Amino acid sequence: LVAALAGMVYSLLLAFASINLKADQTIGGTALNLLATAIAVVIAKYFSESGSAKLNYANRPFLFSIGGLELSIFVPLGIILLIISYVVLYKTRFGLRLRACGEHPQAADSVGINVYKMRYAGVVISGALGAIGGMAYIVPPVQTWNFEVGVAGAGFLAMAVMIFGQWKPFNIFGAAMFFAVFKSLANIADSTFLAQLHWSSNIYNMMPFVASMIILAFTSKNSMAPKAEGIPYDKGSR
């Protein structure tokens, strides 16, 4: 909950820059991404007894067992959020209005939809979900996390997953599972037949990013992105 709230508050900076100031979303997002790492390091050092950017977890939180199989609570949570996202986007008035503001904002405005409010809502919700995803990435696998290391480009990989999934919830889920297979190879390489290859774990860590570049090179031309994606809305333009 705290992570989601923090993500919502931080996403307001991007919303203000891109919606009110009409700044380039890519530049603004990259700047905030770099700033977030620095803020995380400062906060971690403030709360750390050793003064380092590492935080230790006494227990491995957010884990539960089913028949001896240890799972993260974020697994069922992710499935629930996937279903909720689909229902909200395609079966509710709010979702239809939100999609309209991404496809044809001028047309949405002409029927009385406040495009600015809807885009703010979209950014804030995305900030909350992104923060939950970041927490899922750093908490369950380890007992110590170094904030100076960061998440090794996982956020940019998530953007590739979104593009590969054509901005549709269930397609994105399938794309995420595809890239997760490559991501998991680095974790199991030493304990499976892959160990006989004697490859560095860095090679397996590279695979999701290499795969994303190859796939996007062939699929980006058929992208079904919202028509107004990345375009600042000007109420005076028609």
Place the predicted regions along the sequence by residue.
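Alpha-helical transmembrane segments within multi-pass membrane transporters and channels
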Residues: 1-37, 80
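Transmembrane alpha-helical segments in multi-pass inner-membrane proteins
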Residues: 3, 140, 145-209
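Membrane-interface helix caps of multi-pass small-molecule transporters
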Residues: 9-12, 16-21, 42-46, 87-91, ...
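Hydrophobic alpha-helical membrane-insertion segments
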Residues: 29-45, 162-172
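Transmembrane helix-bundle core of multi-pass membrane transporters
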Residues: 36-91, 195-203, 230-238
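Helix-loop-helix "hairpin" substructures at the membrane interface of multi-pass membrane proteins
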Residues: 69-145, 169, 174
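Cytosolic-side transmembrane-helix boundaries in multi-pass membrane proteins
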Residues: 85, 103-117, 190-238
